[in-house]
Amino acid sequence: MMNMQNMMRQAQKLQKQMEQKQADLAASQFTGKSAQELVTVTFTGDKKLISIDYKEAVVDPEDIETLQDMTTQAINDALSQVDDATKKIMGAFAGKMPF
């Protein structure tokens, strides 16, 4: 019976640690950039968009497709960083579960 109680306590402790890491991740910011850094976007760790910034050189009414492509590049870059950080932080808990 004691083993089960210890396992439950350890699981609860790990859950609290994981919740704190998730909160830390959500409070973090990740900035993605396009080629030549003409477009930058910033997301929180819980994938909320904070900002999109465009350099003047990329804003051309005659070539809206380039602006769209660079925006997509920057967004995908930032979200990839969020995913990598999430895997790294949450993956650390996988081997610590007592069951």
UniProtKB/Swiss-Prot annotation:
Localization, UniProt: Cytoplasm, Nucleoid
Low complexity compositional bias, start-end: 1-10
Gene Ontology CC terms: bacterial nucleoid; cytosol
Record has DNA-binding as a keyword: yes
Predominant cellular place of this UniProt entry's protein: cytoplasm
InterPro entries in the record: YbaB-like_sf (IPR036894), YbaB/EbfC (IPR004401)
A family per Pfam: YbaB_DNA_bd
Keywords for this protein: Cytoplasm, DNA-binding
An example molecular function term from Gene Ontology annotations: DNA binding
Region of interest (Disordered), ranges: 1-20
UniProt subunit comment: Homodimer.
Family: Belongs to the YbaB/EbfC family.
Task performed by this protein: Binds to DNA and alters its conformation. May be involved in regulation of gene expression, nucleoid organization and DNA protection.
Name the record gives this protein: Nucleoid-associated protein SAG1747
